[in-house]
Design a protein with these regions (language model features):
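Domain-terminus/edge residues, biased toward the C-terminal soluble/receptor-binding domains
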Residues: 1-2, 185-189, 197-253
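Generic structural signal for hydrophobic residues
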Residues: 11, 175-176, 246
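Active-site-adjacent loops and short helices of periplasmic peptidoglycan-processing enzymes
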Residues: 26-206, 210, 215-219
């Protein structure tokens, strides 16, 4: 299988669209109709950059907010409500990864506490780590970015906070907010490293573009994101290796 590279390395594209998931969950006809109306309204919402003189008109998209930013210059090429707040869900893990890479090493040991696995509901993304289990930071970040493993994100925060920040989980969350502000993010608040829902955990399309541009500068991040399949070897508590694949369809051919 051939890996695709190209424009994905030049532009940061952030889109907040929630209706497809909600529509699947909706059981009542009136609720589906309401969601369909909201979806159509999002398509009709004005695009900020279309009001610029002598600027190419951008396409309508089914999204509450969207942005296309050139990573080299920071120029915004397309924007639709880029500063409106939204719940980021798993793209939170981009900031988690950035903070971990900037403050630790890939050879660090990540240890899983009871708290790290207790956050999970039955349908949350996970690779089945157990309390007391240990893996390397490198293995952990592959699990965070390729498998979107929520318990691993929590353990990365705990371990980095403990090993490098003279604190623990809460110290890492403070660092996430500090780093976000340093990047110029003005509409974000981070309360966890995984993105599981919290009313006080939010960001904007513009802020996520800034975060994505920053983490993309890290060679370790690019290497992980260009990996199609990864194997975590047996651990101190698990005899079998864990295998997961890249789910980004633009990278497969």
């Amino acid at each position: 299988m051939k890996l695709k590279r190209g424009l994905a390395g030049l532009l940061t594209v952030i889109v907040f669209a929630v209706w497809p998931i909600q529509a699947v969950l909706a059981e009542e006809t009136d609720e589906e109709a309401k969601l369909e109306a909201e979806k159509n309204a999002s398509l009709a919402a004005p695009i900020d950059t279309n009001s610029l003189e002598e600027w190419p008109e951008g396409p309508a998209v089914y999204a509450q907010s969207a942005i296309v930013m050139d990573m080299g210059s920071g120029a915004v090429l397309y924007a639709k409500k880029p500063d409106e707040r939204h719940y980021p869900a798993s793209i939170t893990k981009l900031l988690t990864t950035l903070a971990a890479l900037e403050n630790g090493t890939l050879t660090d040991r990540v240890t899983f506490s009871q708290e790290s696995v207790d956050i999970l509901n039955w349908d949350d993304a996970s690779i089945g780590m157990r309390p007391g289990e240990e893996i390397s930071m490198e293995d952990a970040l592959y699990a965070v970015l390729l498998a979107s493993a929520n318990e691993v994100s929590y353990a990365v925060a705990e371990s980095t906070g403990r090993n490098h920040l003279n604190g623990g989980y809460d110290t890492f969350i403070e660092l996430m907010n500090q780093r976000s502000a340093e990047l110029g993010c003005t509409g974000s608040n981070w309360v966890n490293p995984h993105g599981l829902h919290d009313d006080n955990h939010y960001t904007t399309a513009r802020d996520m573009a800034l975060i994505a541009s920053a983490v993309y500068q890290r060679e370790e991040f690019r290497e992980i994101m260009n990996t199609l399949e990864y194997h975590i070897p047996a651990t101190n508590l698990e005899n079998e290796e864990r295998i997961f694949q890249q789910n980004h369809k633009m990278l497969w051919e």
